[in-house]
Each structure stands twice: as structure tokens, then as C-alpha cells.
Amino acid sequence: MKRALIIVDPQLDFITGTLPVGGASEAMDRLATALPKIAADQVFVTMDAHPIKHCSFEPNGGIWPTHCVKYSTGAAIWEPLMEALIALSCPISFIEKGCDLDRDQYSAFEDRYPKELESAEEILLCGLAGNVCVLNSLKDLARHGLASKITVLTDASPSLDDGTALNEIIRETKVKSVTLENLDK
């Protein structure tokens, strides 16, 4: 496989819902438009799929508002992006995380990762939020020895902060970063 694309948590609650990331709708629309040009051989989409009483939720002593409850509207993939994914001809895999009631999970790749990534020459990484789940996914993929293959799509990875935390991890892990516009230049 030449190119894999990982899209982290492009869900309604992180865009227009209970835990919105500034610039997320524009970033996910930009990504949806760029998907055909990205020409990925396989796409992996991670998704928060929390139980109703998840430990990360404020009413249960956590730090986050209730978000991405499995099967809720807020857990759905951003519609323009979902439509663009459906139009692709490559395989698409959805990876749920945060499913355990008493365990928060900021990365879908803590313990394992899709073995298809080993054969990828390039792994593009983007999604929401840049300073939380994209950052932790990057750290875990790098820990699994995949850093040399990773390129972070910075304009498709908006953060709850000003982007500083993600940029710091990009530097630490020595992965590449690029905007969608400059991807194949």
C-alpha cells in the first residue's frame, strides 16, 4: 500500500455539538473536498463511541462535557465528510474507541494498530481535536515505530488550544507536517 489516511474523530459533537473545536467544520469540509485528490489506498476513521455514563463526562467526575455517546446524533460522522468517504473506491475501516465505561481513551492505537499500516509507504494523519486525540494517536503510532511514515495534515487537524501542543509533538516525533494544499508538491 502506498498511502494510508487516518481521520481521527470527525464527529458532530466535535464540530457543532457539545465539545466543538474552533475551525472544525471548515477543516472537515476542506478534507472532504480533498479526499479524491489525496488518493489514499485505505482510509481509517477513528470514532469516540462512549457509553452513556462514561467516566470522562463531567456528570460522572470527568473533565469533558457529555459527547459522542454511541448511537447518538453527536457521534455521527460529519455529513460532507461521510458523503466523500462513501464516494471513494478504496477500503474504509471504522475504529471505535472510548467504549469502556471506566477508561478514557484519546488514541485508538494505544495497544495495537491496523497491521495494514506496516505496508504503507506513507501514513497521513488528521482529525479532531489536534491537541487531544490526533496528538495522542500520533504519539502511539510513533511509539509503535511508524513515525518515519507519518505526515500530519495540519489544516485538517484544528485544536482546542492554539495548535502549540500538536506542533510540539510533531517536532518531538520528527514526523512531517503539511497542509492539504501542499500535500503533493
Feature names for model-found ranges:
Residues 2-6, 13, 26-42, 51-53, ...:
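Active-site-adjacent betaalpha module
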Residues 15-23:
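Acidic/histidine-rich helix-loop elements
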Residues 48:
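Active-site loop/turn elements of alpha/beta-hydrolase fold enzymes
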Residues 57-61:
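Glycine-rich loop at the start of a catalytic domain that most often binds anionic cofactors/ligands
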